Amino acid sequence: MKNRDLFQQDLSLLVKSGLCSRKEYASGYARAVHALRQIKIRADRGELPFLRGPFLPLTDLSFVQENFKGMRMILVVGSPENIAGLRALSGIMQSWIWVDGARPRLCFLDDLDPEVFWELMSIANPMTTGVVVLSESGESEPILLQLMRCLEYWHGMIDKEDLAKHFVVVTSHTSSRLMRLVDRWKLPWWKYPPVAFPQLGCFSPPLLAPLGLAGFDRGRFNMGSGTLCVQFFQGQLKAPLEMAAVVFAGHKAQALDAHRMWGQGSIFHPITSWMQQVSARLNKHSPYRYFSNLEPMNSCTLTTLFFERHVARERLVPDFWKDVPALKTLAQTPMLHWVKEEHERLCQAQVKSGHFLRCINVHSLNEETLGALFMNHVLETLLIDTMYDDAHHDLH
């Protein structure tokens, strides 16, 4: 698998905008290459455990898969930090890729507000709803309370002998209050090692389990993220290095101080939200800040625009419109034509407004592409932060 088969990074509009000189870019690229070596050393020392996630064996779901087979909804109980990546992946899968309605719907219960719980219960049928509980320590009181709520509610709706078929617990510690609930109700469970950087939990095999139960192809996701990671450390992947070089050079030239993630259409919103959270988590040394497309921009903002370019789009039925000659040509034009035209219009509008623009053109959204996009952003963020850390040490 080549990165270019999944997505392409287009920096041409950044080059035309004069964000930085060739000399400044070359200096930034040299720093990025040095930062890559630093990251490799840290990874070899085990300091970046989430980078190993795509290469770990997938969690075996066979012992609960039969129970969850007929579920129409899967309720995920966990902390906001643990399930941020799952929210992003399920959001894009359910709103865009899983459109046939054949898979269970994933919902997330990470808010103690009673209104949130009862709103979910208003659409959840306990007979066809499974609950997956994610808790590393087994002692998180919000998670314990949510599970206790669910057990109380399900207990009144389902026969006691069938109750355990609707629950599965994922935890690291066997001597916890959560395990007392597991023993009391005889709930199925499995143990997983503690996960560092919970906001990168999408690279953790156990934390991908709820998506796997819903039909998400975890193997393809790991293939996309893992292959990209290998290409990066082997020096075959240039996209993160090029972007990091541009960012560092632009900031040094005082032309850049912020980065906005923006997806064309609402389908990319879950991805951009997750990317902002990851950047906030990993960005320890860089003054560079990330924000959403809802915040006002200034002239020193770089925008990353995501665009799916080769997806098959439906056409209108020309014969249906044959009695309206003025619309005949419009009806015969593939939707993809208008999507591309809108993309070009957005790009030109950004450039004319004096904003810096990078485009990431996705070939087609699927599990493999998502894995590559997620890993690319993580590596890019690590590079930028490491470059600023090195620069800080140079000054001192």
For each feature predicted by the language model, list its residue ranges:
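A glycine-rich phosphate-binding loop feature that marks nucleotide/adenosyl-phosphate handling sites
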Residues: 225-230, 292-296, 361-366, 396
